[in-house]
């Protein structure tokens, strides 16, 4: 199941693939595919392949956290439009071939290319998913032989259905089936009733379903070359990319290899600096994780913050007014005009001139106000500078500070803020103050009671000793169906029902309140290994067993929003996330507990309760003073 989730620390949405442990243990095929998918996606990096962010493990499930593709599944788009236009299908097929060519160069054969595994991002670009059936011989040290019958029969090449030896060209055939489906909305080879033998015979005989007349001859020629039943005559992925139809009206950059690892000079230094200085991550650890593309919470925070920064910069370049509606308040305008000092100087000089004119108008003697009514103008025709009633004069005097604060508003000075936490607006409204940088968490401090501070000492010492740099575990509501109710981590929250990869309105995505934080308890484990556990609900809660993620925990209340993305907010982590290549499901029998310094309470001498007669007082000195 794939669900839409929310990363709490950054506020960005992610896609979470949930795998049930019970099914994985019963079926070794599921376990093998899970291990293979996680390892391949950490080795491969391409703009048309989904980015794996984090891998989590709970008591009952595994979780693969990936980037979210808000455009939905390409299947739903074809279903809505019946078929795609030729220029749109050309764009998608070219991006798919680029992704597959990158895989083949790395020694990976996907073997399951179908419309259902093609997603669309926010820019309407293809994103390839699901590497569970991929073959990666020579990379991971193990692979299925290139004779295994796998994948969807409708997209499988003839040599694969015949259980013959095959190679990377099976992906070229699958691309041809996807191209036919995009242009027509149907599959090229269908049989009724379904039979593998009859389907194979249709493929070998080139008995393709009839093509519509609107398809160009160049597209038909490209399609027939991809659907060549003889693998020796079928083009390889490089030859398919050089097809004339795919390069017609293509104005993009020439084909170039895409590195599987981010180079040091390509890192977003602002995001790395924010993570190391504001969120508490070690600078060298952040660099090593990003350069190695190792799926963990640090990598997830980096990519999510980097995407959030890119979206913010794109929105800054958009026009201020769309459809005669201004979507940006004055605080945003003041930030924008910091980039242009000359325009600010011009506005400043004009505002000073207006102020001088207003002061000259106020210096007019009040005798003009006492003139006869016949010489007065009507109230509706009175200029704004000369009001005939005393009430508007008081209002004008009371709003003088507002005019001074906004009449010469300087983007290089602080904005005047009211006591209620809002700032004054030129439109006489109150606009809530928003941070100009959406990546900087706002620190909120709450005063806790003295009793909660004593508990916080014990909890804080253990947190500083372990210093986990990953995330916390879920708590289940219904133990019978853990997949439906589990959330892989308190840094990730599951939103809504399982994803169908169809574009949905933002108002339909609601947070499902399925979390009960009071039942979780952190483990005293090593910083590199901490399993997710579930406490017995019948056991009474105590200060020692109180979870830091509980709403009643003082350590959670103090920095509930300031340190959400920091490693100090982390409580526990499964064995699965800290895997290296080939170590994802390795059993670990021992849990090493660090020997930390004893709490302050254990080193203090025991306190004894004193009775009223225990202490003796000499009252001789007090005689005569009562």
Curated annotation (Swiss-Prot):
Compositional bias segments (type: Basic and acidic residues): 336-357, 392-405
Catalytic residues as annotated in Swiss-Prot or TrEMBL: 112
Disordered: annotated span: 336-407, 477-574, 590-615
Residues in Protein kinase domain copies: 1-246
MF annotations from Gene Ontology: ATP binding; protein serine kinase activity; protein serine/threonine kinase activity
Keyword entries, A-Z: ATP-binding, Kinase, Nucleotide-binding, Serine/threonine-protein kinase, Transferase
Reactions mediated catalytically: L-seryl-[protein] + ATP = O-phospho-L-seryl-[protein] + ADP + H(+); L-threonyl-[protein] + ATP = O-phospho-L-threonyl-[protein] + ADP + H(+)
Tissue/organ expression: In the egg, expressed predominantly in the animal hemisphere. This pattern of expression persists throughout the cleavage and blastula stages. At the gastrula stage, expression is restricted to the ectoderm. In later-stage embryos, expressed over the entire embryonic surface including the open neural plate at stage 15 and the neural tube at stage 22. In tadpoles, strongly expressed in the neural tube, motor neurons, brain regions and sensory organs (otic vesicle and eye). Also expressed in the perisomitic mesoderm, brachial arches and embryonic epidermis of tadpoles.
UniProt biased composition (Polar residues): 374-390, 518-532, 556-566
Enzyme Commission identifier(s): 2.7.11.1
Gene Ontology terms describing biological process: intracellular signal transduction
Family from the record: Belongs to the protein kinase superfamily. CAMK Ser/Thr protein kinase family. SNF1 subfamily.
Name of this protein: Hormonally up-regulated neu tumor-associated kinase homolog B
Organism: Xenopus laevis (African clawed frog)
